[in-house]
Amino acid sequence: MIKLSKKYCLGISFVLYILLSVCEGHKNLTCDFNDVYKLEFHPNQQTSVTKLCNLTPNVLEKVTIKCGSDKLNYNLYPPTCFEEVYASRNMMHLKKIKEFVIGSSMFMRRSLTPNKINEVSFRIPPNMMPEKPIYCFCENKKTITINGSNGNPSSKKDIINRGIVEIIIPSLNEKVKGCDFTTSESTIFSKGYSINEISNKSSNNQQDIVCTVKAHANDLIGFKCPSNYSVEPHDCFVSAFNLSGKNENLENKLKLTNIIMDHYNNTFYSRLPSLISDNWKFFCVCSKDNEKKLVFTVEASISSSNTKLASRDNTYQDYISNSSFLTLSSYCAFITFIITSFLSFIL
C-alpha cells in the first residue's frame, strides 16, 4: 500500500475543496450558441439538430443569449427576443413579455452585423404568478443536395441546427416591498397609489405624496413612477436623498445589490444586503413640473441575528434550486477534505 504524507493529503483535499467551492459560486446564465452550444454543421450532415439551453435564474438576475457573429450567420427568433417571447418549445404562442410576465424591464441588445441582433440580455422581473417558462430560438439554416438513387434525380433539402433557449421565470412568495404610483392595486409592489385618484381627492392639498416601506436584510425593494414623471436622483439606488434632503452615495452605507434602473419604464428595483449594520432611511422622488412630488421612502432596519440567519437560509435555498450539481459537489469535496485530513493523521 502506498503511504501518502500528511502534507500531500491535506494539500489535495484543500485544493479540491477550494476549486469546487469556487465553481459553486459561479452560475452561468448565458446561452452561448457561438462557442458552447455550437450550431455549426458537420461534414456530411443530412438531418436537423436541436440543442436545449435551460436557465433557472433568480429574480433580478441577468440572462443573456449569444446567437451569431460577423462570421456566424445565425438568426434569432423572435427577432425582438425578450420584448416578445414564445410560450412553448414549438415556436408557437408568441407573447409580448410585458403582458406575459408583468413587471418586465431592462432589455439590452448588441448588433455586430447590420439589421441583425447577435446578443440580447434581460433582467428577470419579479413574478407573483406561478413560475413559467419563456422561449427564444437561435437557428443556423443550410440547404444541402441529396443525391438521387436508382436513377432518381438529386434534390435540395433545408436542414436547421436549432438552439432552444428555455428560461424559467421564478415565482415570488410575496410582493416587492415598494410603491407603485401608477395604480391603486399593484400586482408587484406592496403598496399602490393612483395618482389620478389622489389628485382629484386632494386638488387643494399641495403636500407631497409619501409612500414609506419598512425593509430588512435581503428584501427586494422598488418603485414605479408614472410615465410622464422623472426620477430624482437619476441613479436612484446607487445614490439617494437622506432625511436632510442631501444626495448621498448609498454604496458607502448599504451596498445595495441587483440594481435595476429602468428609465424607459420608470421602474426601479434593488435588493438590500444580507447584513445591515445600522438603521438607515433614504428616499427617491418621482417629480413633474407643477405637480405634487411622489416620494418613495425606505426605512432599512439593522440586522438581527434572526434576520441574518434567515437571509443565509434563503441564499442556501437558492443555491440548492439553481446549482444542485455544484452544491452536491462541494459537499463531496468538503467530506473528502475531512476524510483525507483524518487519514493523513493515521497513515
Swiss-Prot record:
It holds the Pfam family s48_45. Transmembrane segments: none annotated. One of its GO terms (cellular component) is side of membrane. One of its GO terms (biological process) is symbiont entry into host. Residues 323-347 form a propeptide. Gene3D superfamilies: 2.60.40.2860. Residues 1-25 form the signal peptide. Processed into a soluble form. Glycans are attached at N28, N147, N200, N228, N242, N265, N322. A lipid is attached at N322 (GPI-anchor amidated asparagine). Disulfide bonds join C31-C53, C67-C138, C81-C136, C179-C211, C225-C286, C236-C284. Keywords: Cell membrane, Disulfide bond, Glycoprotein, GPI-anchor, Lipoprotein, Malaria, Membrane, Repeat, Signal. Disruption phenotype: No visible phenotype. Parasites grow at normal rates in vitro. Residues 27-172, 175-305 form the 6-Cys domain. The keyword tRNA processing does not apply. Does not have erythrocyte-receptor-binding ability. Heterodimer; heterodimerizes with PF41. May form an antiparallel heterodimer with PF41. This is Merozoite surface protein P12. It comes from Plasmodium falciparum (isolate 3D7).
